Design a protein with these regions (language model features):
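Short linear motifs at protein or domain termini
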Residues: 1-105, 222-229
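Amphipathic alpha-helical repeat elements characteristic of tetratricopeptide repeat
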Residues: 18, 82, 93, 113, ...
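Solvent-exposed loop and edge beta-strand segments that line ligand/cofactor-binding
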Residues: 178-182
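Amphipathic, non-transmembrane alpha-helical secondary structure
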Residues: 25, 86, 97, 101, ...
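Short alpha-helical transmembrane interface motifs in multi-pass membrane proteins
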Residues: 81-82, 173-176
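Conserved amphipathic alpha-helical segments that form helical-bundle/coiled-coil interaction surfaces
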Residues: 109-174, 187-196, 204-214, 218
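Short helix-capping and inter-helix turn/linker motifs at the boundaries of alpha-helical repeat units
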Residues: 15, 136, 183-184
Length: 229
């Protein structure tokens, strides 16, 4: 049987807890773990080929992030709260707009340190995403693209504010990015944002980033997410 996306075995790494948490978030984002599905330590440990301890810690992080609900052995994937999701996207529109504006301003003024050049490379590469790729690859590319903009803003408070919210955005984009039409829109919108930043046009970058977030939210809703009113 083909291994479910996001639940591949974990290789030994510096932090098994982080790896386990990341795999579980990806599995929820791609729908491999559905809302209401039981999260059993033994089964997840077997799937990821790790001991139960990192799974236990990862499940606690999922619950703290709002992606799992329940207690003890009755932990399940949390349903999507449509009202809260809308509020999260509303906040993200403001944050992403500011991040894109700040990044464009720094590029325009030539104030970016050399160590930030890898983030510029990510913006350049992500302008030309291919339609034909697994949904999980698209989600990862999307996360890298937006993370690059946050890093280029050089605003640590902004980064610390938005990072904890991204597991929810990854979850909402899973269904939307499985559709070719949304992938085409995403690639086009990313290209518009990246061009505005790299050409040092702060206002255009802000507007493009805000539009992209609003478009992403509409696509997530239209994709028919299972939501809790």
């Amino acid at each position: 049987m083909q291994e479910a996306a996001g639940l591949r075995p974990i290789k030994m790494s510096a932090s098994l807890i982080d790896s386990a948490y990341e795999r579980l978030v990806e599995a929820i984002a791609t729908g491999s773990l559905q809302p209401g599905e039981r999260l059993t330590q033994e089964k997840l440990a077997a799937r990821l080929q790790v001991s139960r301890q990192p799974i236990s810690h990862a499940l606690n992080r999922l619950r703290a992030a709002g992606l799992a609900t329940g207690a003890g052995r009755r932990l399940v994937v949390a349903p999507i709260d449509s009202r809260r999701l809308g509020e999260l996207y509303q906040l993200r529109a403001a944050i992403d707009g500011l991040a894109a504006q700040l990044a464009a301003e720094k590029i325009s003024a030539g104030n970016l340190a050399r160590e930030l050049s890898p983030w510029i490379d990510i913006l350049t590469r992500n302008r030309d995403l291919e339609d034909v790729a697994p949904t999980l690859d698209w989600i990862r590319a999307d996360v890298r693209f937006h993370d690059a903009i946050y890093r280029l803003s050089c605003n640590s408070v902004l980064i610390d504010t938005v990072e904890p919210l991204w597991p929810h955005f990854r979850r909402s984009m899973g269904n939307a990015l499985s559709e070719q039409r949304r992938r085409s829109h995403t690639r086009s919108e990313h290209r518009t944002i990246a061009n505005a930043i790299l050409e040092g046009r702060p206002k255009d970058a802000e507007n493009a980033a805000r539009y992209h977030v609003e478009s992403a939210y509409s696509a997530a809703v239209e994709a028919g997410l299972t939501i809790r009113e």
